[in-house]
């Protein structure tokens, strides 16, 4: 079993300093095997915000896998937005926009969905869908295949103002073909884990979707700052939401999932 700390939507530049300090302390104590950050490290992609984000990342337990979010693309600098949209991210955070991590139990691929002209809601490219299949094709059997992206592939409650990433159906088909079992994302600032069925999904329950809330941002959406602590194995995932209670992070909710007949099912 591996322990993964899944953080998202830090939004340095509009963040809670106390929450940031307590988060570092919590992770230092828990010592996860892997830290995954699914985008929006900054509020407005400014040099100063990226510098603070970089200093924060350097204090995290290693290894760390990071993907960008739409807030990591400059909003008001129009030239930079379209000519060098992720130049600052690549300078301060990570030059690799398709990071990959693998050990003897898991394989994790990160993709940049803050691309094209659709920064806000994101989009998966045809090349990225192909990469999902080609990268995981080389992963030995018996390892949990994980995809990390900023924009979710589906919304927990359809019909509201939240939208899935562009070309989500194409991406989900590629993931099913590649044997991806777990998807980590953020963007909505709301914690969620479970199945997100849809008419364009080949079969329900094949993929477990986990959304992280905002770890330290003051841009809250009806729930406290939080991150996910995952205990994962080839056929099981326990997702624990670690919420910020003003002075410390602690367990707020925990759900266990297991593969039953090739499909994820919540266990009592």
What spans do the regions from the language model cover?
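Short acidic, glycine-rich surface-loop motifs adjacent to enzyme active sites
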Residues: 141-156
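Active-site environment of divalent metal-dependent phosphoester hydrolases
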Residues: 13-15, 43-48, 70-78, 116-120, ...
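A short C-terminal boundary segment appended to hydrolase-like catalytic domains
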Residues: 231-268
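N-terminal active-site segment of His-dependent metallophosphoesterases
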Residues: 1-59, 75-79, 96-97, 131
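Charged helix-capping and loop-helix junction motifs
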Residues: 21, 49-53, 125-130, 161-170
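Extended active-site neighborhood of metal-dependent phosphoesterases/phosphodiesterases
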Residues: 51-134, 139-141, 174, 202-203, ...
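Conserved beta-sheet core of the metallophosphoesterase superfamily
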Residues: 160-238
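Active-site neighborhood of phospho(di)ester-bond hydrolases with catalytic His/Asp-centered motifs
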Residues: 7-8, 35-40, 64-70, 112, ...
């Amino acid at each position: 079993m591996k322990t993964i700390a899944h953080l998202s939507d830090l939004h340095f530049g509009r963040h809670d300093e106390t929450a940031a300090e307590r988060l570092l302390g919590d992770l230092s104590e828990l010592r996860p095997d892997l830290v995954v950050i699914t985008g929006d490290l900054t509020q407005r992609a400014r040099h100063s915000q990226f510098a603070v984000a970089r200093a924060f990342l350097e204090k995290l337990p290693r290894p760390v896998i990071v993907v960008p979010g739409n807030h990591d693309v400059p909003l008001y600098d129009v030239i930079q937005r379209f000519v060098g949209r992720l130049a600052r991210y690549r300078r301060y955070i990570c030059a690799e926009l398709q990071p990959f991590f693998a050990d003897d139990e898991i394989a994790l691929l990160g993709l940049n969905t803050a691309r094209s002209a659709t920064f806000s809601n994101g989009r998966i490219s045809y090349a990225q869908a192909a990469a999902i299949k080609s990268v995981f094709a080389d992963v030995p059997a018996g390892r949990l295949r994980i995809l990390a992206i900023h924009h979710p592939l589906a919304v927990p409650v359809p019909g509201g103002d939240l939208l899935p990433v562009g070309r989500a159906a194409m991406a989900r088909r590629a993931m099913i073909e590649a044997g991806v079992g777990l998807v980590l994302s953020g963007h909505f600032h709301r914690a969620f884990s479970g199945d997100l069925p849809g008419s364009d999904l080949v079969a329900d329950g094949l993929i477990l979707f986990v959304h992280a809330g905002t770890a330290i941002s003051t841009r809250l959406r009806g729930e406290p700052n939080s991150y996910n602590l995952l205990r994962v194995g080839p056929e099981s995932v326990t997702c624990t939401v670690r919420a910020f209670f003003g002075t410390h992070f602690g367990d707020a909710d925990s759900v266990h999932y297991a593969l039953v007949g090739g499909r994820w099912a919540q266990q009592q």
